[in-house]
Amino acid sequence: MIQRVYEGAKKSKMLSDVIVATDDERIVAAVKSFGGKVIMTKDSHPSGTDRCGEIAANFEDVDVVINIQGDEPLVDFRQLDALIKAFNDQDVQIATLGIRDIDMEAILNPNRIKVVVNNENQALYFSRSPIPNFAHSKENPLTQYPYLRHIGLYAYRADTLKKIIQLAPTALEQIESLEQLRWLYYGFAIKVVETNIETPNIDVPEDVAKVLDFIVDFF
């Protein structure tokens, strides 16, 4: 799976380098076996963002860092390019992806993260619960509101990455188990770039079969 993620990322012509960051020797061996670039990190990082921060500190000329998680075997280079292009706006400090193609099963599934945005497409909140809540809706929620599912790819300006990895954890992120809520809590704006490219990820073992079916249908 790591190889698929790596090779998918390498297809982006806008990335200057792709590095696997890990604290596991087995992953190091796997990446080296297919000729990938890998760097060992400390094993104490609470999140992938912190791990990215350790690696980015070794590269002084980096301006934007993209955190591509290892559970995204179908990552598409067009998604990565869209994230990078968001930084053409000098006000953007953090960017991530969202997709409107969502059904009720995903809205109710706590492993599918939902996000709501303001009129500037900046995130207001991320949640494992349905947001907005439709308990009092008298219509079909899917026709009443354009629900947005979060795709867990993050990009940060290098100087912003240095700042957010210094932030103390918050109760909000801990109860939802969503690290990006820490950044919102401390006042960092997160630009949500909409995409129509569907790339199922693997959050739980049951997702493996869904990803394999997707590969059979679309590749």
Please identify what each model-predicted range represents.
Residues 75-167:
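Conserved core of the sugar-phosphate nucleotidyltransferase
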Residues 14, 34-35, 119:
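Short, structured coil segments at secondary-structure junctions
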Residues 15, 61-62, 90-93, 188:
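Short, high-confidence coil segments that cap the C-terminus of an alpha-helix
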Residues 1-21:
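N-terminal glycine-rich phosphate-binding loop and ensuing alpha1 helix
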Residues 142-219:
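Conserved alpha/beta core of the MobA/IspD/sugar-nucleotide pyrophosphorylase nucleotidyltransferase superfamily
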Residues 22-23, 75, 156, 203:
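A conserved hydrophobic position in a structured secondary element of the catalytic/binding core
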Residues 19, 25-68, 72-85:
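Short phosphate-binding loop-to-helix
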